């Protein structure tokens, strides 16, 4: 009887490992391309209407939301701008007070934030409230590595 229980436990463990591995593989985030028109350097100011339209059309893009009245000791916008220029990509920008009128505000509650959006859905974003993201705001290479975990460059 003990032997049967041991065999059943081993089988359940093996099946669990197989299932978890399978779901881990499926849930793995695949890199994606931005829309073609975002593979040229620009820090393009957009309105909340533009963002809502891009979401509705299920577009893929990078969005920077910022507070125009906030000045930081470390000029994060220069980090983002330098990266965009070096990699020849466009980052859309919107003031946070306008950003609040988008659907994305339900998820991203703080500025300064960079949001990676694929097919109209937020994949990830820099959270200004999390200590783990501070280095990404301060270093072009670290910011670039973070972006390139999700986005394929041309």
Task: Write out the residue ranges for each language-model feature.
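N-terminal leader/targeting and pre-domain segments
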Residues: 3-17, 21-58, 139-154
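Local sequence-structure signature of Cys/Sec-based thiol-disulfide redox active-site neighborhoods
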Residues: 47-86
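Solvent-exposed, acidic/flexible segments
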Residues: 44, 69-73, 136, 140
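Hydrophobic beta-strand anchors of alpha/beta hydrolase catalytic cores
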Residues: 61-63, 91, 114
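Non-catalytic, surface beta->alpha helical segment in thiol-disulfide oxidoreductase systems
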Residues: 116-154
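Short acidic, S/G/P-rich loop/turn micro-motifs used as interaction or catalytic elements
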Residues: 68-72, 99, 123, 130-132
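Thiol-based oxidoreductase modules, predominantly thioredoxin-like and allied folds used
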Residues: 65-67, 88-102
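Structural micro-motif
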Residues: 105-119
């Amino acid at each position: 009887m003990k032997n049967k229980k041991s065999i059943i436990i081993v089988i359940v463990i093996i099946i669990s490992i197989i299932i978890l591995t399978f779901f881990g593989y499926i849930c793995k985030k695949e890199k994606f391309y931005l829309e073609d028109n975002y593979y040229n350097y620009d820090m393009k100011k957009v309105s909340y209407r533009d963002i809502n339209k891009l979401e509705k059309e299920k577009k893929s893009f990078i969005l920077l939301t910022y507070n125009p009245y906030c000045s930081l000791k470390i000029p994060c916008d220069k980090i983002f701008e330098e990266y965009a220029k070096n990699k020849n990509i466009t980052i859309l920008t919107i003031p946070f007070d306008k950003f609040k009128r988008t659907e994305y505000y339900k998820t991203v509650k703080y500025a300064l934030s960079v949001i990676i959006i694929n097919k109209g859905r937020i994949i990830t974003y820099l959270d200004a409230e999390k200590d783990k993201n501070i280095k990404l705001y301060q270093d072009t290479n670290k910011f670039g590595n973070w972006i390139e975990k999700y986005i394929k460059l041309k």
